[in-house]
Swiss-Prot record:
Residues 534-554, 577-615 have a biased composition (Basic and acidic residues). This is ATP-dependent rRNA helicase spb4. The Q motif is unique to and characteristic of the DEAD box family of RNA helicases and controls ATP binding and hydrolysis. Its EC number is 3.6.4.13. Keywords: ATP-binding, Coiled coil, Helicase, Hydrolase, Nucleotide-binding, Nucleus, Ribosome biogenesis, RNA-binding, rRNA processing. It comes from Aspergillus oryzae (strain ATCC 42149 / RIB 40). Component of pre-60S ribosomal complexes. The lineage of its organism: Eukaryota, Fungi, Dikarya, Ascomycota, Pezizomycotina. One of its GO terms (cellular component) is nucleolus.
Amino acid sequence: MAPKPPAGTSSRAWDGVSPSLSEWVLEAVSSMGFTRMTPVQASAIPLFMAHKDVVVEAVTGSGKTLSFLIPIVEKLLRLEEPIKKHHVGAIIISPTRELASQIYHVLLSLLAFHPPSASVINPSEDDDVPRQKFPSSTLKVVPQLLLGGSTTPAEDLSKFLKQSPNLLVSTPGRLLELLSSPHVHCPQSSFEMLVLDEADRLLDLGFKETLQNIIRRLPKQRRTGLFSASISEAVDQIVRVGLRNPVKVMVKVKGTSGAQDKRTPASLQMTYLTTPTIHKFDALKHILHSVDPTPQKTIFFASTCSGVDYLSAILPLILGDDFQLISLHGKHPANVREKNFNRFVNSYSPAILLTTDVASRGLDIPSVDLVVQIDPPSDPKTFIHRCGRAGRAGRRGLSVVLLHPGREEDYVSFLEVRKTPVAPFPHPISFSESEATAATKAVRKAVLADRALHDRGQKAFVSWLRSYSKHQASSIFRVADLDWESLGKAWGLLKLPKMPELRNFTGDRTLGVNLDWDDYKYKDKQREKRRIELLQESKEGDGTQESSNKRKATETTAWSNKLDDRNKKQKRREQKQRRQEKNKWEKMTEEERQKIRETEQMVESIRVKNEEERRLRRAGKAEAANAGKDEEEFEGFD
């Protein structure tokens, strides 16, 4: 029986869908606690069930998954006869293993209410319990999950041949491998529906060729659905996927002014915190303790995998024991990713997931209270997806992005232009020099205890800088504006790494640390043994002779010649960089070039606007610039 909707919501009642839903589907959504459809479900489900191609753009956490799962299972269960053995009726493609797995488990929850399908998916293992048997002519949905890293292609094919699934949920690469087998069939007589979840990400450069190869193997006469939180940014590529006169569904959220221009849930409050460089990490502790009630599930976003590895070791020293810190990134083995993801989801104590953008899209992590972006993403469109991990399904959530003082504060205006407004963090936070010193001291103590942690820190810092230098809003995030010494101390480094970006740095590269590097040891005995061997080799004859030769070469080279050589090398580097940029530009489509031009124009206009505002403030003429703006205070989590 369908759940009874609240008064005044009959247009979103589950039993009011046309074509009507099966009774078992109504029972399933009722048991899941969905009293009525979300706006995206109310719009997309009837269209997709009515044999329309759909392009669905909706805010994150709006119920997109059921918007395509329900039409697919309804379609497969309303066929005139069962799909032939080893024939596929529908495919759902996801960009990540985690999202594909999540979709698959939601599908299993749905099919548990359809006895014929449930009997195939979860056969009883207890011989004393009589199994309900259904004739072979009974229509069933038999799904298979295809994930790279957890099984081999041969194992996937073996399972396909044994179970003959008619619905595949997969990542692009593993799906293409299966479809390449002559034993897997997707003819027009059998294949019904294709869904691309997180479509804009699937259409990124990394997936284009694979996706095109998949689509070539599918019949043109099919129903296709593209679902994403930002499908508008990939509209120019949708035609290539082969939609036939698609219906576009766009669901937006009203902002406080009443205008439908926000691209995030109304229950999500997005904020920023300007943080002095030296306080980059101890600010995280302030944020966690300033929010009331204490967030039970928090996500910290870092920019790189190396950064996650290093921060997972040092942040507990700063945050204390109040929170369980769990790391997750794309370079973890598949079993580690799954284990850590489940640890976070199932944690009953306050937990923090420290992750990269692998967790920014699609994953429906329940009950996330707080999202903190330690580093703003290099791709601005990822910002909204990171924030959207909180405030899902109407639950109150809070997101914070950390910005350095100065030019980075222009990012606030940049986001506003992109219809993603952020407000100042609602709780006042004060920083003290002694606190920063204590944090640096605690981290350095751990780093000094094991040279391996120093190596991880150096690698993490370099990878962070490379990510920072590739930010699309490059006039806001400028490497030249970074405070190197404060950053190094905040990261707990013992010295700044050797990098081209530090070529003209004249400050203290040792960061005030006096250390005998020859005596600096690894905790791991094998690594320490190898280090000592290399150290001894460098001190023996070959190393001495080589050093002597280098000294002689240096002594016989005129200073003017060395300067000239450096200038030539710098010139060659600049020429090489220009060639690379030219080649990259030539390989871009006109649409991609136009996007870059628009971003550059947007950033420049924001820079000019902010410069003018700063000039007016200095002149004392902008007292009322922000008058009349309502500030919404965060009232706690649900």
